Swiss-Prot record:
This is Aspartate--tRNA(Asp) ligase. Its EC number is 6.1.1.12. Residues 188-191 are annotated as: Aspartate. Its cofactor is Mg(2+). It comes from Thermoplasma volcanium (strain ATCC 51530 / DSM 4299 / JCM 9571 / NBRC 15438 / GSS1).
Length: 428
């Protein structure tokens, strides 16, 4: 008999034979009957056994979280809360759990995050925890489908590189045979090379690595980056793609996971597009109205972003950032080269992602290298692609974990990461 997922039991008829597999979440042995709560990735169901000597002997010493195979019949006349249960006929123990559990799965005992991450394998069995990753998967799938619908193709670029994408020192070194190499911060350089190759619209979903010694609730040293690059486009085109991608991801998450999220007290609405736009200089004026002094060329502090974010419902763009705050590949504004054709997507005070129109002229690119005091020799493979017909192009990179954290209203990015890598954690 083929396995039936618990979430599909309602599609069957009363008295249909079923075979379910999963974890024993809870167990109650009464005088004449035993009640089991079985769980698989799709949900839970109550299983009822009439007590026989064999059943009682098997169940009375069976620990929670043991893995079972149960055969029985659908009972749609059940008085259980769900109105459906399985009348058990046989049970096979596939794997017996040890006692005690390192973490409770259903008991209302709240472990701290460090303890949970140290025992992540069992923490992920909790419905409120696993629902985060179901939601994250749906967000990513919605974004992927949208990008495919817009003519983007998915690509995969190297994660072991010889040069820093951003030109900085925040890199993890690795030994690559006889050469020094690094884990890539971003697929930026390779995305741009593909514009020269004529691919025109590409996106990538993959790991990115930042050797930054921060230890905050919003940063990871390894994260999943969703990156796009598009030819014959500017920063405005990139913003339109980004806001629609974010909306599509949230929309798909609500369609696929809305019920589970509501059961966990998370209510989400689809954001309205277009997202509001405000320039960097307009942000300075907002701060000055609050009596704050701010110098052009400085980055905004968390407190300053909180003040700016109070003017917006949720998502908004800050545009036209100073050239001094942007990487070498960012296109300066034609009318005012002290600012750039760039943007940050914000959610209130939290930065979601950055993007820009890129430099496509090789002479301007070399000028930007010199302004940033970068070693041109390290980027020869990249510069070469600009000499033989590089089209105007733009793009962005979006951290999946941070987006999920923001959308679900969570307080720590580690909640949206299966096995976080931060300043102190490389296990498990």
């Amino acid at each position: 008999m083929p396995r039936v997922y618990i979430g599909s039991l309602r599609e069957l008829n009363h008295n249909d034979n079923v075979e379910i597999y999963g974890w024993l979440q809870d167990l109650k042995l009464l005088k004449n009957v035993s009640f089991l709560i079985m769980r698989d990735r799709t949900g839970t169901v109550q299983v009822t056994f009439k007590n026989t000597p064999d059943i009682v002997n098997l169940l009375k010493e069976l620990p929670r979280e043991s893995v079972l195979k149960i055969s029985g019949k659908i009972n749609k006349k059940s008085v259980s809360k769900s109105g459906l249960e399985v009348s058990g006929e046989s049970v096979e123990v596939l794997n017996r759990s040890e006692r005690p559990l390192p973490l409770p799965v259903i008991d209302p005992v709240q472990a701290d995050l460090e303890t949970r991450l140290n025992n992540r394998f069992i923490d992920l069995r909790k419905r409120d925890v696993s629902s985060i990753f179901n939601a994250e998967s749906s967000i990513l799938w919605g974004i992927r489908e949208f990008l495919h619908s817009q003519g983007f193709i998915e690509v995969h670029t190297p994660k072991i590189v010889a040069a820093a994408t951003e030109g900085g020192a925040d890199l993890f070194p690795v030994k690559y045979f006889e050469n020094d190499a690094y884990l890539n911060q971003s697929p930026q350089l390779y995305k741009e090379i593909l514009m020269s190759s004529g691919f025109e619209k590409v996106f990538e979903v993959g790991p990115a690595f930042r050797a930054e010694e921060h230890n905050t609730t919003r940063h990871l040293n390894e994260f999943t980056s969703i990156d796009i690059e598009m030819s014959f486009a500017d920063h405005n085109d990139a913003m339109r793609i980004l806001e629609n991608a974010v909306k599509s991801g949230i929309e798909n998450m609500i369609n696929e996971n809305g019920k589970d999220l509501q059961e966990n007290g998370i209510n989400i609405s689809i954001p309205e597009i277009p997202f509001p736009r405000i320039t960097y200089k307009e942000c300075i004026k907002l701060l000055e109205k609050e009596g704050l002094e701010f110098q052009f060329g400085n980055d905004f502090s968390p407190e300053e972003l909180r003040i700016i974010g109070r003017n917006f419902k949720d998502f908004y763009f800050i545009t036209e950032w100073p050239s001094s705050l942007r990487p070498f590949y960012t296109m300066p504004n034609r009318d005012d080269p002290t600012i750039t054709n760039s943007f940050d997507l914000q959610y209130r005070e939290v930065e979601v992602t950055s993007g820009a129109q890129r430099v496509h002229d090789p002479d301007l690119l070399l000028k930007r290298f010199n302004e940033k005091k970068l070693n041109i020799d390290s980027f020869k493979f990249y510069i070469q692609a600009f000499k033989y017909g590089m089209p105007p192009h733009a793009g962005w990179g979006l951290g999946l974990e941070r987006l999920t954290m923001i959308v679900l209203g969570l307080n720590n990015i580690r909640e949206t990461t299966l096995f976080p890598r931060d300043r102190t954690r490389i296990i498990p």
